[in-house]
Design a protein with these regions (language model features):
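Short helices/loops that flank or line small-molecule/ion binding pockets
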Residues: 80-88, 108-109, 214-224
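Short, surface-exposed loop/helix-turn segments at secondary-structure junctions
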Residues: 235-251
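Extracytoplasmic substrate-binding proteins
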Residues: 9-10, 20-22, 101-180, 201, ...
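His/Asp/Glu-enriched short active-site or ligand-binding loop at hydrolase and phosphoryl-transfer sites
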Residues: 186-209, 267
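Short helix-initiation/N-cap motifs at beta->coil->alpha
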Residues: 16-18, 71-82, 119, 205-217
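Short, low-complexity disordered leader/linker segments with a strong preference
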Residues: 1-23
Length: 296
């Protein structure tokens, strides 16, 4: 519902949680509190319209925002009400994980807050981009981003379609505590799109919002995967990446697993496994190149 006058355009949108936001002009002082929305907004709006990125912007292990882009925006902010208010934003983009107190306080002051969910698959990711594009008044640009994603994915699919189904490899991805990638979560979707069989999906119940299931060593042994995908993001300086590699290689529980016997332990950056933007296509390509280098 767009009514135009010489001075302003009024439009309304719904965020991912169904809350209605009304704008009388395109937002020009945007604060993004999540790394995924940093990345989406960077392709939707001129950086002059961004007053702050999330705290991870420019960290190449988790964010696709370059150091140059982070410097151009010049400010990073966490879920801190005072820090956000100082920036005088006309739109704050948050996630369902953002503190409810912060969201409420911003709304009470009259600052629009757009909340995104975490997509579980490609369709939901495209919807996230399309909806956010509408919120910042850039629907056409949103469509262009999605078209580019579709094209890149199609080209990748052409390469991967040469692989007979019996040659698909089974992979299990790990974070620093255990195996990950339950059926129905985003990593499961990414592996499937890369023509990789997600070992963890076979032994876990589908994702539900409330239950987190630990994938045990015994489950991993039962799966007997061809490849282990290991993490490399040392987010709190306490993770020993190389040490974790040796720990898994030398774990007696895994000694008969194909991945260990054939030394197929590969590192995949967390910016791919926890992707939350149009870069999902980069994640699919990264996994495919890691598991099937011979196709590239």
């Amino acid at each position: 519902s767009v009514s135009k006058s010489a001075a302003s355009i009024t439009y309304e949108v719904f965020d991912d949680t169904g809350r209605k936001l009304t704008f009388n002009k395109k937002p020009e002082r945007i604060v993004s509190l999540t790394y995924g929305t940093d990345e989406i907004l960077t392709e939707l709006v001129d950086l002059k319209r961004m007053v702050a990125f999330s705290r991870w912007a420019g960290d190449s292990e988790i964010s696709f925002i370059t150091k140059e882009q982070a410097l151009a925006v010049g400010c990073k902010v966490a879920d801190n009400l005072e820090a956000i208010l100082k920036l005088e934003p006309d739109l704050v983009v948050a996630s369902v994980a953002t503190s409810n107190d912060v969201v409420q306080s911003l709304e009470n002051i009259g600052i629009p807050v757009y909340i995104v969910r975490s997509p579980h698959n490609y369709q939901e990711m495209c919807a996230k981009i399309k909806n956010l594009a509408a919120a910042v008044g850039e629907s056409k640009k949103g469509d262009v981003i999605i078209k580019n994603m579709d094209n890149r994915l199609h080209n990748l699919e052409v390469k991967l379609s040469h692989l007979p189904s019996y040659q698909r490899k089974v992979a299990v991805a790990f974070n620093f505590t255990s195996a990950m990638g339950r059926k129905g979560d985003l990593l499961d979707s990414i592996l499937t799109m890369a023509h990789v069989i997600n070992g963890a999906a076979a032994v876990t119940p589908p994702v539900s919002e409330h239950k987190s299931v630990v994938i045990s060593k015994e489950m991993v042994v039962t799966i007997n995967p061809d490849i282990f995908l290991l993490p490399i993001w040392n987010y709190n300086n306490k993770q020993d990446v190389q040490g974790y590699y040796y720990e898994i290689m030398n774990d007696p529980a895994y000694k008969n697993v194909k991945a260990v016997q054939n030394r197929q332990l590969k590192f995949v950056s967390d910016k791919y496994r926890y992707v939350a933007s149009q870069h999902i296509v980069d994640a699919v390509e990264k996994i495919a190149r890691t598991v099937y280098p011979e196709l590239f």
